[in-house]
Each structure stands twice: as C-alpha cells, then as structure tokens.
C-alpha cells in the first residue's frame, strides 16, 4: 500500500456534503489533510451573508470532527476581476455565460491551487467535484464522474492537465447516495444538507433582481418571425434561447395554443425574437461556431475529428464532427439538429468517458 502520510492535500471545503466526504476519504487513504474555505464574494445581503456564515460554520464543524485544521482565504477581488466582470460583459453583449466554468478555471484551479502550493505547502488540492482523472502514457486525462446524474466534467473542461495532475477528486468514483451515506455514518453535520443551486454569488436570490443591480434594463419589443410586435420584454439580458416561461405573451388573438419560445435576440434593435411551437425551425441549429478553445491537453487541434458534444449541462451527448478553423475557432456539425444552442454557453467535447475540452459558443448555424 502506498504511504501517503507525508503527502499534503488541501481540500476546498465549501460547507457541503461532497467536500466533507472528500476530506474524510483522503484521510482514510492516509494523506495529510487540511481544509481551506474560500470566500469569493462580498455579500451585501443579509440572507446571503447568513448562508455564507452557515457554510463556514459547517466546514469548521466537519474539520473539527475529522481533527484537521481549516484555513480561510478571501478571493473576492480575484473573483470580481476574472469571473464577475466577464459575466456582466457577456450579458451586456446578449449572450448567456456560465460563471461556474470561469470560477473553476480562474479561482478553484488557479488562485486556490497556487495559494495551496505556495502558502500552505500542498502537494495536491482536492475538491468535491464529480469527475475522475486517469494517467495514461505520461498524460493526465479528465474523465466523467461515475455518477451520470452528477457528472461535473462539463464545468471543468477549461482546466489544463497540469492542474488536473495536481488535483484529487475522491467522490468522482462514487454515486451521490453513497456519499450521503458515508457522511451520515461518520456523523458529519453536512450529511443531509441540500445541494446548492444557482450561481455562487447570487445564492437563492431572484436572478432578474440581481442582474438589475449591475446592468440597467432596456425594455423593447417582442417580435414574431413575420415581424409582428406581440409584446414587450423588460430587457434582453433576462432571456435565453429556448426559454418558454416568463414571456408574458400567452392568450394572443389569432394565435394557436402552442407555447412561444425565444429563438433569438436582435441586439441592434433591442428586440426579442419568438416563435410558436417546440418544433419551430427557428429553434433548431445544425451546428455551431465556437471560440476560446480550452483543450485539457493544451494542444490545439489541427484536423477534423469525430466526437460527442454537450451544449449545456445534463444534456445527452450529441454525436458530431468538429473542424478547427484556426487555433481558437471551431466549426461543429451535429449528426441531428439541436434546439436552443445558446451563444455564451460552452460546447464541451467527449471521447467516450474522456473530456477533451471545450469552447464558448459564438453562434448557432441555421439553414
């Protein structure tokens, strides 16, 4: 058996069950384990402040139970500069970004990794992400988590193999119910804590209220494919492709009963484009153009290849053909047309269980 007693691992403790069990499992494997709680957002709201304080308290309780120290660090400035500013700029441009992906790339596997190595003397960091890693021929691959329902490789595609080589993912080999069972067996306070939802810095607040604090909304027309104005939107940034609820345009005269869907944004004229029916052609794309490629092996792709792609989290894999247009731009053609391919979101590529990397969707291709 490997002697890990001199191998120091700093676990990112969020105050949730996954990171709690990660710390416990690493301890069982003989590692020298310490915890680190990251504060990435300066709360300005009482409910948010209370939630963050509760998370820290829960992380401390778990570390006390395991008999390990808990360090704390404030990355709010780095988060604002590298994640939040980008998030706002994308919304302003009419796209729908994914801040969790940026947070993993810039904070958890960059700022945290550097701090753990340089200031705390870590050999590895660990997180509660549902992914796995595998070493093959001197390379480190990122693999989907074993629990299909919880696999988080979609959110980690932008991390390079150097970072993955320095990271451990203990719960990636387990299914979620097993993780909760271990936490309960070990009497960890987080065993029945519900999974956090929503974007880390918004918490449980209403998204529209949050955005309005930072970006002034500009109301405009809601328009059909024939150019008919059928309503008013409160701001393009509040809407995303494929959205059906919250449009406020039900029960129109001369229209059938089919629901309306957002099919596009006309940024120049501040108009929201909608069409009726889940099978309306305007909702579907045969492919996409993506930029800002991040390959796990950090090697730009030079020739056309086959793989599968996800254009959003929890989506079924779509077989596709990928053609690099240059080192930072890809053209992706799906085997079957896909609904609601959304600029700003990420296209993430897979070869079976291996996550190859991904890129940001720039535009969807329509016939």
Swiss-Prot record:
Keyword RNA-binding tagged: yes
Chief location of this protein within or outside the cell: cytoplasm
Residues at the active site: 103, 200
One of the GO biological process terms: tRNA wobble position uridine thiolation
Site (Interaction with tRNA): 129, 345
UniProt family annotation: Belongs to the MnmA/TRMU family.
Record-given protein name: tRNA-specific 2-thiouridylase MnmA
